[in-house]
Structure formats: C-alpha cells, structure tokens
Amino acid sequence: MTTTPLIDPFQRAIDYLRVSVTDRCDFRCVYCMSENMTFLPKKELLTLEELDRMCSTFIRLGVKKLRITGGEPLVRRDIMTFFDRMSRHLDSGALRELTLTTNGSQLEKFADGLYAAGMRRINVSMDTLDEKKFAEITRWGRLPQVLRGIDAAQKAGLRIKINAVALKGFNEDELFPMVDWCAERDMDLTFIEVMPMGDIGNENRLGQYWALSDLRNTLRERFTLTELDERTGGPARYVRLEETGQKLGFITPLTHNFCESCNRVRLTCTGELFMCLGQEDNADLRKPLREYPDDDRALENAIRAAIALKPKGHDFDYSRQRLDGQMTRHMSHTGG
C-alpha cells in the first residue's frame, strides 16, 4: 500500500526524525543543564515498545533517517533492544539511516552492538581536548573515558563526526588543535553556536556566545576555506580546508536562518512532537499512541496534523545583547 509522504505547508518533505529517548544524562554540561537538574518521572517517558511503535509509524509515513538523541541515549536502560528492533527497518529498506548523537561516555561498552544494529555513523559531542577543561565544562565527565569510547567506535567500524560547541573564552585557543586532532583520526568536525534553551543555573549564555563568523576568520589565518554546496536539509553549512582536504561544518542557528530546507521534526522522550527546535508549538502524540494501542490510524492522523503546523522558521535571536529567543525547555528533553 502506498502511503502519502509527510509534506509541510511550505512543500518541504519531512523525512528525518530526531528522537530523544531520555532526558537523563551522565554529564551536566554548563551550556545544557543545571548541575542540580530535576529529571522527568520515568512513568512519563515512552516505553521502548512505545518508541518502537512511534518510530515505525513515522517510517511508514516516509521518514528515511532516524537519529536517536537524549539526554544521553546510551544511559537509557535496555536501549540496545530498541536499536536492534529498529534494524529491521534498515533490513527492509524502509529506513535509509539509523544514527546516534552521544557524549561518548558509554561508547566503549556499546560500540560493537551499535554497529551490529546497522549504525554506520555517529556524532560525538566533545568541546575540548583538555582533560581539566573537559571536567569543567561537563562537570561530571571524564575525557579519557570518552577517548576510549571513540577509539572503540572507530575500531567497530563506525564513522565519527565530532560536534564542538564554540564557547567564548573557553575553547577559542583549541580551534587549530581540534581541527588537527580530527584530521589525524579521519573524523569530520562541526562547530556549533551555543543555543538559547532552558535554565542552566548560574551560567550566562550570552557570555558564552562565540559567533562562528569570528571562528571562520580565525581559521582563514591558516587555511584556505572553500564553500561546499552541500545540503542535507539540516542546519550545517560546510567548507573544505584546501590544505588538508578536511570537511568542516558550521551550525549557526543564531546568526544564520537555516530553515529554508528543513526536513526534520523532533520527538521528545514523553511523546511530544516539536515541529521546530526554535519554537514552542508541539503536538501530543503520546495520547493517541496510548488511547489506541491496537490501531495506528489515530497516531498517523495526529502526525499529519502536526506536520501541517510546521512553521517556516525559528525564533532564535541574540541581537542587541538580549536573549529574546530563549526557549524554556531543555535540549536534554527535546533532543540535541
């Protein structure tokens, strides 16, 4: 049976779903959450079986790429069961890619299993190569553990992209070392501007903000940057460093509107569907999922109704030294 694909009001095909499987994390990164973060009661979270049904419904409606996020997805109990279940959609060809964003803390344990489940690429969030600064930025993290995880992932056959948040006064001096380190290990690298989402305690996001336009100018002191006309439907813009052949990505939600080709929606660990990372509009998909356990039609209708409300663009704004666009929810809940 042919199913009509998900098309939003601006004629963008929605074929990429990002799913947060937990809001919990074993780090407390200063730009992400407070050290005394209060997490959701477990009863509010979708079960692994419900996540399977939810994702399978999206795949039936045309989703081709599924990225699992958190929190830290690998701290969710029995998460490998979910990945193993999702692999059937890769085997059938219904799903083109199953992937993961992780802080790397659990990779040493799970890398082989992830590859066996059909993953071939993962993103690892890591902002510094300095062990002391790593402990400072993550509060609870340990760099050697993450580096062992990265080694294990590469040994298992997983291709890795490092995501580094650009933080003013913190990792500015590591720009070239990070580029060199990734080049030596044949890993892609993307720099990300800090996002204005959720209460993070005493930290000041505006003080952390390092415009990637400044970062690019610093890179030009050493490298020739060639713009790549590469579009993934996502926020990253890519350049090639001619001296090394490396590909670098830049995600600039605050200084560059990346919305025109957006092909994705985000499902939280509680079953809320956010049509845009930078807006608060959402749809409750947990309700039809649980009210009709043996019939997916209500869930399909709710998904289509939500996609019909997808906005053209986001509301992030750091202009005039304000936090006008700050979202109240946390990335750990929405999915990073």
From Swiss-Prot:
Pathway: Cofactor biosynthesis; molybdopterin biosynthesis. [4Fe-4S] cluster 1 binds at C25, C29, C32. Its EC number is 4.1.99.22. Catalyzes the cyclization of GTP to (8S)-3',8-cyclo-7,8-dihydroguanosine 5'-triphosphate. It is an enzyme of class 4 (lyase). This is GTP 3',8-cyclase. The keyword Chaperone does not apply. GTP binds at R18, R67, T101, K161, R264, V265, R266. Belongs to the radical SAM superfamily. MoaA family. The keyword 4Fe-4S applies. It comes from Dinoroseobacter shibae (strain DSM 16493 / NCIMB 14021 / DFL 12). It catalyses: GTP + AH2 + S-adenosyl-L-methionine = (8S)-3',8-cyclo-7,8-dihydroguanosine 5'-triphosphate + 5'-deoxyadenosine + L-methionine + A + H(+). It comes from the Bacteria. GO terms for biological process: Mo-molybdopterin cofactor biosynthetic process. Disulfide bonds: none annotated. SUPFAM superfamilies: Radical SAM enzymes.
